[in-house]
Amino acid sequence: MPKTIPIIIANRSILVKEKDNDKFVVFNMPGIKEEPNIPFYHQFAGKISECQYYFKEFMKDLYGKKVTKYVLAIIVPDDTTPLEHIFINEFFLHSDACKAVAQLTMGQTLSKSHTKYISLSRSCRNIILQYINNGEILAQKQYDINTYSTKQIAEDAKRLHIDIEYSGAPFFINNFNMNMDDFLDMGQVITTKEFLDKIANVQTEKV
């Protein structure tokens, strides 16, 4: 099995697991400004070669010159669009800092002990409700972060998928970004530390 480097694309930065422990360090690209409702990495497109160079040097500092033998297991926000998935894949793959790239959404990583569950998370633009079964996203609803109703989301969660209506499912609140105060009483809260511990042990065979 190829060696894996877990990477998290958070709301404002990229977190990379260190080589010899389970801690994560932040990769910040100089000159990137936060814009409302727009993932920060969109700005990489305007200076793609420069961003890829900085990332490659960052990874070489962490993992040495043999970093190209690793597979990057990239954990992305739950509302990542198909085009964003492609951009993320191409950006990292062509940074010359890895052997290959694999992606999972945050919601798909929340539980190894449950084959099916509901996840709720918050990105820079949406609240995302998902039903996960055997690692696959079978249903999803998104709500604008400026107009959502906690009551409506709670009701929607009960009928997000026919499986839930008949047999129920555990409900996980992903509080990795510490921005889920409105939802903490809806289910089991996954703290920042718990989430990082889960991702630190992600392997590409699971991605």
What is the meaning of each model-derived region?
Residues 1-10, 25, 32-124, 131-207:
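Nucleotide/phosphate-binding catalytic cleft detector across ATP-hydrolyzing
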Residues 11-18, 24:
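Short N-terminal binding/cap micro-motifs at the start of the first secondary-structure element
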Residues 17-20, 28-29, 132:
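Surface loops and adjacent helix of pleckstrin homology
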